[in-house]
Amino acid sequence: DGTDTYTTPPFPVPDPKEFNDYILVFPAGSGIKPIYVYLKEDPRKLPGVVTGHGVPLSPGTRWLDMSISNNGNGAPIPAHIADKLRGREFKTFDEFREALWLEVSQDPELIAQFSSGNQTRIKQGLTAKAPIDGRHYGPKDIVKKFQIHHRVAIEYGGSVYDIDNLRIVTPRLHDEIHYRR
């Protein structure tokens, strides 16, 4: 019953944030064997260095035109934006996302392609909102902001910070790529 047994904690006591695996033990007599569980850290929350070259934009090309960002595989990261990010280390993918949009805000040709409301967002490092036709209307919420899609999914070995693995897509296309193809 455990009333006459003392449990001694391990020494030194491990830092709780280092625990990422467990053994689940079920009650005696339940017939269920212990299960080993490993909780993997989300790679987007891990640091990384930006790689990749992006794609040169043809003169006069609208980067996030709906025909690109709402169809196919989305819009690639422009090469001149990739050049500014390549080699930089970020603590998380969220920090990378912010830096990407801030670099876009510094490019007069790219920033001019956005509405004034989106320009304000982008200059703050926030993601631009997609046009209404590109939004995803889910059962619980409406996703309005452009998404950064990993062409080769992270779970299948796709690099988190490789610009050549990234595409900017509308929420609608992102949903289609992940759940309807």
Briefly describe each language-model feature range:
Residues 1-147, 152-181:
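Nuclease and nuclease-like effector domains acting on nucleic acids or nucleotide cofactors
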